[in-house]
Amino acid sequence: MKPRLLTTVTTWLALVLPVVYLSRPCQALPTVNFTANYANSTSIASYNLEPEIPYEELEEPRVLPLKAVLPVEASTVDSSGVIDASKSEHHELPLADAAIQPHPDSNSVLKVILEQPESNDEPVTSTHGYPTFSADDNFVPSKPLNLSVLEVTSTTIKITWREPEKLNGAIHGYRVYYVHQNQTLLHLPILKAEAAVNSVYTYTLSNLKPYTDYKIIVAAFTKKFDGEPSEVSQRTDIAGPSAPKVVNLTCHSQDALFFGWRIPQTYYNTIDYYIISYRNVVYADFREIRITANASIVETSMIIPNLTTNSLYEVKVRAASTSVINPKQIILGSYSEPKKINVQLNCEKIPPPSQRQSYNDYNLAVMIGILICCFGLLFIVLTILLWKKCFHAAYYYLDDPPACGNSGGGNSAGIVDWEAPCEVAGEMRSSIPVCEFAKHVAALHVDGDIGFSKEYEAIQGEALNDEYPSEHSQHPDNKAKNRYLNVIAYDHSRVHLRQVPGQKKHLDYINANFIDGYQKPRAFIGTQGPLPCTFDCFWRMIWEQRVAIIVMITNLVERGRRKCDMYWPKDGTEMYGVIAVKLIREEVMATYTVRTFQIKHTKLKKKKASQTEKLVYQYHYTNWPDHGTPDHPLPVINFVKKSTAANPADAGPIVVHCSAGVGRTGTYIVIDAMLKQIEAKNQLNVFGFLRYIRAQRNYLVQTEEQYIFIHDALVEAIDSGETNIKMDAIGGVVNHIEFIDSQYKLITSYQPKEINLTSALKPVNAIKNRSSLVPLEGSRVHLTPKPGVEGSDYINATWLHGYRRLRDFIVTQHPLIDTFKDFWQMVWDHNAQTVVLLSSADNMSFLQFWPNESEPIESDYYRIRLVSETSENDYIVRNFVIQSIQDDYELSVRMFENPMWPDMAQPRSIFDFAVRVHERCAEYRNGPIVIVDRYGGFQACQFCCISSLAMQLEYDQTANVYTYAKLFHNKRPGIWSSYEDIRQIYRILSYMPKELGLLKCTELRTEFDEAAIMTATPDLSPLTRPAHIMSQHYNRFLKLLERWPVDQSKIGRDLGQYLRDQLKAVLGGTNIIAVKDERLVRQHQSLENIVNDVHLKAHPRSLNSTATGLSGEQCREVLSSEFLEYLNKEGGFEKLGLRGGRWMSTEAVRHVPVMAAEAIKFLKPQDSELFIDMTFGAGGHTKQILKAAPNAKIITLDRDPVAHELAQEMAKRYPGQIYPVLGRFSELPAKLKELNVNQRSIDGMIFDFGCSSMQFDEGERGFSISKNGPLDMRMDKDRCPDAPSAADVLARIDEMDLARILKVYGEEKFAKRIARAIVEARHSIKKIETTKELAELVQTCCASEFRLDKLQRPSHPATKTFQALRIFVNNELNEINYGMILAQHYLKIGGKMITITFHSLEDTIVKRHVMGNVANDMANKLPLKYCSHTICHDQTVMDAALKPNWHQMTKHVVVPSDAEVEENPRSRSAKLRAVVRVE
């Protein structure tokens, strides 16, 4: 709003002031000078009287009443003020009448008349003249009234308003402003205030942007001033989409065209329709087809039917969108370029015109080819001559630094100004000051992170539009070098390996790109996780590019999938091509591992021997989930800082890789660049930098979740600042109270929500808590639950990480009397052999929870016995043995009681105690350290902090108190009560001796398994535990399995009983020898988990629970090493009904017709009657009909060519009775016409829906889960080879549609999760092309490796996904719908129809037809764009056909008997309906 200005106008008035005194004659008054200031339109702010004679010469009283006159307005207004001129020369005079409004741009006269009070005479007025009075912008017009919008289009907005209520002068016109996106202020030329009806004005804003928000401002103005503004906001309407791009127009058949197009490049809001216009060029008019559209689908296609053969057709398409102003209005877009094509017979066999060349064109191409070959040969000869002249025959190259200009075809050395503001997707983007970044991120987080979604979509959109060449990645010689098909290396920025004499040109390829850092071109090399075939290329790149730091952000195997191969030696030295790599040292930390390699070039010549070897450091981050983000950004920030700081100034780029080299790799690079930009310029631009580096390698920062994590990490980095404190500076920090207090506030800023404390706040668990210090759900320690006992898995204990391991400590409260056994259960379950007690027993609230030497503690599974107790200088050491009651397994536990820690006599004793504890733990290295204080709070967490930070100080002479304190608080809020707690940690660390030895006694060595390497810091207990202990665990498992409760209500269906019987039969009395072969670890499913999951409903427990008293981890160790090894060797899996460690599928069973007896009972076939077996399959039902009526005639229909062949064979055995027909339900009318079968002539029809068992038996058909094969699922792929397979559907479908398919057709409760995983795998790994790939991917998305069917039998978790895809690919539900209609038309009155369904949707369609309650969309809720064809019916014909004429033969649906289900498991979900055709 334009501010009101104050302008002072001074008017000198020469006034003749007559003064009349009572009882005295009138005499002339002196002339007085007058000064007036206008404060607003209704008052005079001040005036100044300057009489020509002194005041004291005036006779008493000197009271001068005042009258103000405005002659221009032809009115005189008396003021209510009386002025005493003797008291002051400065007075304030309000004009009481607010109606007086002087015109500031007109001549006004102010006349002041002084008169004698109480005089009856007329005032004497003497005026020397009226001076000119002018005012300032105090007098501005008020707001225009009733500003509103009349009409809106995509580029115009018509507005209207009325003139202001207060004009305050002559209105010269109006100014109209409009604001676009709060950044671009545009104003229109001045509008002349022309006459308008009733003072109503209109104006049309033009040349606006479609679908854009505008704020419109209107203000009146006078000759000198702008008035107060009125505002209104309005969004313009959408404009029509741009022209779609036609990508396919082919002749589909003699009367149909196949037409495909791509979504328009530009559209607003959404695309609602496509309008396809086509015409025979003989005619002028176009015909139109309108179809609904989905803006998320990039390519759309359809078949245009009912065309004239041997005609030329012209086709074009345009998109249309619904108006956002008027939903009833459709905004049409531009037409695509018209395309023409001939429709003719057998056109599908004729190549398109683009492939047919004229004879002259062919000759020209041949001539050009010959010339190219000649030049090529000449070039090769010259190249060979030059090579022989300039190079030695031996293989070598010099160790020169890579040129910055062109050592690999990389991006330009110049720095692109990505920091400059730019407009993307209609919005301005620029660098954000550090002080405003937190507010900026908070704004992006609102409304479900909608701001992040928009920014990331803008980046993704640009990436899709940028088509950078990647020819080398697509070369046949190089495709095998790409881990993922769609993650390639752009040619312009890829890293070139130096040529080896004699090698092919394309052997210089590696899937790696140069990526710029902040103000440093080619600061990084982003690459994929090396494959075995690229190990040598990878190490050549390390050597040639002078790399000193490798950053690895992936584990070798994640979620059962190999993400990277181990490209370095496990021990010693290995050769990778010409590079020898030796592992020198390995330091394992909780979240990352640092490895030191010595690499040597074995073929290098012309260099000193000392320069043939280099040291390379690998920083391997091991706690970053695939496609996800870490739980907290602090460890990542520290990792980025340490790894980048380790790179020497004269070294080459830092090589960063994850699995694909795009998602986590890009996240790392962006965080580093932004940290450097903050340091250099105190600002940052995440959007601009990521947008810039995406032109150097595709898919950098692969998910929106990673993009959000970058912002959150940078907010944390800005808030916390530098948190690593050097050893010699720690003492100074102790006295820096403000610094510690600010850290404390940040450390304790996180406040958990109630959902994070679900278990701790349950009433059954609340009594187990001493205080408000309770564990969060994500970090609490779980106990082995007791069947049927709620809360039996809870204990007030929290996992905390240490310097070496993620689960190094368990912090817990002093046990209550009711939780003594829970405490020892925790020690037993998690194999914790070291306990630190920092509280003392007082025989009141804090009781002794350990046994005396004469009184052991017993539970249902174990006995705790005190072995010894000794006192040392500052603490007491107790040794316990926990003995299993079922077997002879023992667990030794040592307890250190030190209630005075850290208030000990000598500072050195604080650290000596920590060393002593960790030395004890190092003896076993197979479990956590349990730390106990009164409430599981400050004292226990202080011990964890001190011991972890002492190791850090030994390793790199820095301590990060802030990180440990904050992460501990986030896992157990409330442990720090004041900044003094943090200060005390700094104080203790300042006493730390330089040589402590704590780091050495906790040293870990990464153990890698040859088959499945899960993490760089695994639990090493299986490798250190004696073999006889493993056997004891196994024996315990067998014994306790026998005690598993048996469900007597379902004889023969109880899995527990089944397993027990089979175990006895298979194992007998065999003694199993412990096996140490690591290759078997975690390759097979735990039998224990199967038992638990099967009985989950009857005996509720968590999925991680066990029935044996063993922990889930111990069961996996036992079963994966000893038991499964034995079963593999002895064929035990087959004897157990298991295959390869997993449950056998029930698919592979002999073909038995389902409910054949019931079907024949209702069908009642008679000789000479005509039947149709609508789903012949293997002919089971047909055989039963012929058995009941030997002379009956049967038409056998099946879409499967294999089934059709079986029908033909049967027809040879029954000549004149079997009539095989190959086709779908929808094709039956034409087939029956060929057989001269008319409507109302069939005596009975039988439907057995679903997939036949022989289709499951053949893996190459693509239906089977247990047998690997191509993911096909087409029942009639030989007849319709162009129809999309299941693999085609998964390669093209979007996530939303896929989730809907799985949800509706498969009734899959994990539909969204599975759909997301399939789409992510398609983009980041490869397209899913085999049944095994799909089955394994679905399995990773489910909570268990099997599910229970309706008979409580284990089935594969991918069963429902396969079912949904099969139904969709084969358009089964639509076919069922057609089948029901055909039955109504072809059955005689009295004819019978038998339907057998296996899916709820199948039965629903049948039921609705039978009941006469058909919903037209029942079978077609999903888009049919992936189906092989679309069949359209006239609506009136459909309505007539769907009239019900059925009588049900049974009141309820018929289900199979228990005996049949046992004999034929496929029948378990079958439902039979029998109906009769009536009038």
Curated annotation (Swiss-Prot):
CDD domains: FN3, R5-PTPc-1. Residues 387-1479 are cytoplasmic. Residues 1-28 form the signal peptide. Glycans are attached at residues 33, 40, 146, 182, 248, 294, 306. The chain crosses the membrane at residues 366-386. It is a single-pass type I membrane protein. Its main location: membrane. Residues 452-717, 740-992 form the Tyrosine-protein phosphatase domain. Its EC number is 3.1.3.48. Residues 143-242, 243-346 form the Fibronectin type-III domain. Residues 29-365 are extracellular. It is found in: Cell membrane. One of its GO terms (molecular function) is protein tyrosine phosphatase activity. Keywords: Cell membrane, Glycoprotein, Hydrolase, Membrane, Protein phosphatase, Signal, Transmembrane, Transmembrane helix. Interacts with C-type lectin mosGCTL-1. Interacts with C-type lectin mosGCTL-7. HAMAP family: 16SrRNA_methyltr_H. Belongs to the protein-tyrosine phosphatase family. Receptor class subfamily. This is Putative receptor-type tyrosine-protein phosphatase mosPTP-1. It comes from Culex quinquefasciatus.
